[in-house]
Swiss-Prot record:
One of its GO terms (cellular component) is cytoplasm. This is Elongation factor P. The keyword Protein biosynthesis applies. Gene3D superfamilies: 2.30.30.30, Nucleic acid-binding proteins. Belongs to the elongation factor P family. The gene is efp. GO terms for biological process: peptide biosynthetic process.
């Protein structure tokens, strides 16, 4: 149990039959009435984001999330197979668990699998990945007035905006948080 007064960003709690991650919180002490904590929470099972208000001093249950380092092996239809690096145990996850993550997953990539009481909640990717450009228009020399961009498709099928100097075959560093171009590798 933890007091809502001790909330921290990234804390996982169990409230209303759900496992929630604290994204943001604010302690509020109005001039009249008692203090409360306004929080923004993400449901780790569904991905839904909800704002919730707790009375000051209220206690909530902490949820101990287990993070296991695993290696992505391969896709088998709509199932994706991961292997635990210590035990070599294989875990299969359906594609609907990995909708966004599939844009960046490559064979042999190391990821963190998050679970709570043996229930898999999701996959945490590395902050950046290196992917090869498979398709893009050729850049036009001299057409760089205002940091212009063009569309490029990488080896996983993900499409993003890149600077004009990027060509097919280039390896890009991509931010997995928002899917944006960072640099060439």
């Amino acid at each position: 149990m933890i007091s809502v007064n001790d909330f921290k960003t990234g804390l996982t709690i169990s409230v209303d039959n759900g496992i929630w991650k604290v994204l943001d919180f604010q302690h509020v002490k109005p001039g009249k009435g008692s203090a409360f904590v306004r929080s923004k929470l993400r449901n780790l099972r569904t991905g839904a984001i909800q704002e919730k208000t707790f009375r000051g001093g209220e206690k909530v249950e902490t949820a101990l999330i287990e993070n296991r380092r695993m290696q992505y092996l391969y896709a088998d239809g709509d199932t994706h197979v991961f292997m635990d690096n210590q035990t070599f145990e294989q875990t299969e996850l359906p594609a609907d668990y990995l909708e966004y993550e599939l844009n960046f997953l490559k064979a042999n990539m190391e990821v963190q699998i998050q679970s709570y009481e043996n229930e898999t909640l999701g996959v945490e990717l590395p902050k950046t990945v290196e992917l090869t450009v498979t398709e893009t228009e050729p850049g036009i020399k001299g057409d760089t007035a205002n940091g212009a961009t063009k569309s490029a498709t990488v080896e996983t099928g993900y499409t993003l905006n890149v600077p004009l100097f990027v060509n097919e075959g280039d390896v890009l560093v991509i931010n997995t948080g928002d899917g944006s171009y960072i640099s060439r590798a």
